[in-house]
Amino acid sequence: RNPCFSAILCGTALLAPPAPAQSADGAGLLASTPQSVEDLQRIERQLQQMLPRVLPALVCIELNNGSGSGILVSEKGLVFSAAHVVDKKGTTLKIILPDGTRLPGKTTAQNSNSDAGIAKITSQLNKKLPCVEKAEKMPRVGDWVFALGHGGGLDRKRGPMVRLGRVVSLKNGVIQTDCKLIRGDSGGPLFNLDGKLIGIHSRVGSGLEDNLHVPMKDFNALTEETAEGKTSLTPSPEQDSQPFSTQPS
């Protein structure tokens, strides 16, 4: 199914007609301010080129009576999500692929301070799964980004929801954007216009600028701490000693 596309840009939807494929030029668009309709259409075309690369890796995560989103980051079924979505380490989950396949999973690590959570598909796989590439650097304020998620819950007829926006703040090491998120989006991915994963949706706010995302550096730290067998998971140095509040979606 086609994704539900919602582009929030100063209250104006990007509804340019489909354009022929062109070479990706996300780097040149990342922090540029559109000066014309043509600029807006370039941004939308770039987004349309990236979606086929990343949508196959988007998953829905079901736990008890709730659900959230996640993104595959390895061909062997490793999933990044929000800690409040995957719950504590060892929790059993259902991970639903884009084609509707439901697979058993388990939470392998989480940090409630940063709200970073990692899960893994536990069933034996007979094929490599689609996955996305993680960005090596933090985004900059003003960068164009897009958010994916199963907002409102999994709906295969509608498809996943896509939101376009910009980074508005990097306060305390947390990414804040104006990508409008709703319940069910938590744990979903945030990408730059090159299609690289830069964050995971954590807090869903009522305002356009109230949406927070966990950056990749917190997942990298969590992965390293887990590999080293550490049991005490602490926030990254760039964050306040007090955790920011998370609002499950």
Regions found by a protein language model. Name each.
Residues 71-72, 180-201:
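Catalytic nucleophile loop of clan PA
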Residues 1-7:
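Bacterial N-terminal signal peptides that target proteins for export
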Residues 44-47, 57-76, 102-104, 187, ...:
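A conserved glycine-rich beta-strand in the N-terminal activation segment of trypsin-fold
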Residues 61, 91-99, 145-149:
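Short conserved beta-strand and strand-loop elements enriched in small hydrophobics
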Residues 17-21:
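Sec/Tat signal peptide C-region and signal peptidase I cleavage site
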Residues 67, 74-116, 123-126:
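Catalytic-histidine neighborhood of serine endopeptidases
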Residues 128-174, 178-185, 201-212:
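Flexible, gly/ser-rich surface segments that form the specificity/activation loops bordering the active-site cleft
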Residues 25-51, 93, 127-129, 151-154, ...:
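C-terminal cap/linker of serine protease catalytic domains
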